[in-house]
Amino acid sequence: MFASCHCAPRGRRTMKMIHFRSSSIKSLNQEMKCTIRLLDDSEVSCHIQRETKGQFLIEYICNYYSLLEKDYFGIRYVDPEKQRHWLEPNKSIFKQMKSHPPYTMCFRVKFYPHEPLKIKEELTRYLLYLQIKRDIFHGRLLCSFSDAAYLGACIVQAEFGDYYPDEHPENYISEFEIFPKQSQKLERKIMEIHNNELRGQSPAIAEFNLLLKAHTLETYGVDPHPCKDSRGATAFLGFTAAGFVVFQGNKRIHLRKWSDVCKLKFEGKTFYVIGSQKEKNAVLAFHTSTPAACKHLWKCGVENQAFYKYAKSSQIKTVSSSKIFFKGSRFRYSGKVAKEVVEASSKIQRDPPEVHRVNITQSRSFHSLNKQLIINMEPLQPLLPSPTEQEEEVPVGEGVPLPKMDVSEPLIASSPVKGAQCADPPDEEEDRVKEDPLTISELAYNPSASLLPTPVDDDEINMLFDCPSRLELEREDTDSFEELEADENAFLIAEEEELKEARQALSWSYSILTGHIWVNPLVKSFSRLLVVGLGLLLFVFPLLLLLLESGIDLSFLCEIRQTPEFEQFHYEYYCPLKEWVAGKVNIVLYMLGCS
């Protein structure tokens, strides 16, 4: 009887264990629905499993389009905290998503081509055109009034073709929303260019001409990240093919080329851009609303720098956001770089796939998207006061004309290559890039708040600059040292006790090292490790002084000095410490000289 009672529960436990294992295997094979919204607002659905990686979805959409130049594109999603992320191809989709299935994602342009002329296939140009059209509609592409009219006319020509009085009413542009602020003056200018300058252009040529104009604008390819600078002013950060850019109001206040950016890092809510030694402001710091927004900003910067800066993907290294002696987030861009993508595009030899275009009337982005997103979200306030009288007449103000192209000269419709010859060579364009503030419009850069990757909460950002704990520390430091008076005998007694304890500690440590006293092996190994560490420190410290102070031009010393980590240590830690020690020494010498 006793044996039967003992075996029964054991059998039940075994059955439960088998049931647990079978359910876990079943959960691994469970399919989850994933919906991807495309650039024309259509949707594609598929089913994935728990271990499916992000690369599967990217390949799935590229196969759906028959897209070969796929390295410019990526898939973006939003977590429950309204923070945007780019889907990482080498990680499991299930582990990246912080919400429950079914999942909804968006297929978007991740890296904007620096030169649209080098895009091989019409399909790729069409998808980039759809992305630029979205950027225009949501206010991310800031430009002058004349440029805005030309871009709008290219969109109308691509969507509707030539102008015919019998088919197009007098105010046919007003039926469609192309810009976030679309005035009657802008609509009249768009119709004028559409009627007179773009006649005869096919949709492919009109789209190509739009790309040629858009890629010359300062905000081309900018995915705006709102944050606060060191003074508390709101700024928009972005990454382009030229480098890291900062916009405030209607001006680009910073442009740091990728060759001048040594390192990008973040700590909590603070994002740092560390430049080379020749820069006036070697380190730029910005504050985001949340740590997740800061990490997303850092990842975007690392990926864009790797894509546009390096000549080969094999040159890309894993980067860390940490300081020198502390471990932080590590990340590596795993895709191709821009030069490799252009080289691969030049080798494409196939019959171009058919392009299925969707015009404005069939797209939801100009109707339902405006109602669902724009109205439900409060737009960011302009950073600089914009003239209210001109807002109704001029949606994008007459600013300083940007380089390269003149809108008054239409591109030749018969050949996009001939029209492209009007543009200056890329090398001359890069030589004209300046880092001084550049006025690009009379209106403040104010993209739609509903589509920003890192929403800004002004109250939360302002809390970064308010430290209540600072007041408590000041109160604690107000204690007077006058209450700590003691007589000379008490100090002498204390000194004798300290000397006695020191002698005992030295004798005890000597006995441990010689083996006269038995101690725990763990303690002994720790003490030996400590001694070895101190010995290494005594060796490394003179070597560090040799690197910092000596002018020896050995090859390995020069390589160490040029590393971003060493430059960061030199400017952020060593120089301030050196100045502080020098100041203290000068004070002591001055006091000795006076005495």
From Swiss-Prot:
This is FERM domain-containing protein 3. The gene is Frmd3. GO terms for molecular function: cytoskeletal protein binding. It comes from the Eukaryota. The keyword Zinc does not apply. The keyword Cytoplasm does not apply. It is a single-pass membrane protein. The chain crosses the membrane at residues 529-549. Keywords: Membrane, Transmembrane, Transmembrane helix. Putative tumor suppressor gene that may be implicated in the origin and progression of lung cancer. It is found in: Membrane. It comes from Mus musculus (Mouse). Residues 32-312 form the FERM domain. InterPro entries: Band_41_domain (IPR019749), Ez/rad/moesin-like (IPR000798), FA (IPR014847), FERM/acyl-CoA-bd_prot_sf (IPR014352), FERM_2 (IPR035963), FERM_central (IPR019748), FERM_CS (IPR019747), FERM_domain (IPR000299). Pfam families: FA, FERM_C, FERM_M, FERM_N. PROSITE patterns: FERM_1, FERM_3. Coiled coil: none annotated. GO terms for cellular component: cytoskeleton; membrane. PANTHER family: 4.1 G PROTEIN (PTHR23280), FERM DOMAIN-CONTAINING PROTEIN 3 (PTHR23280:SF8).
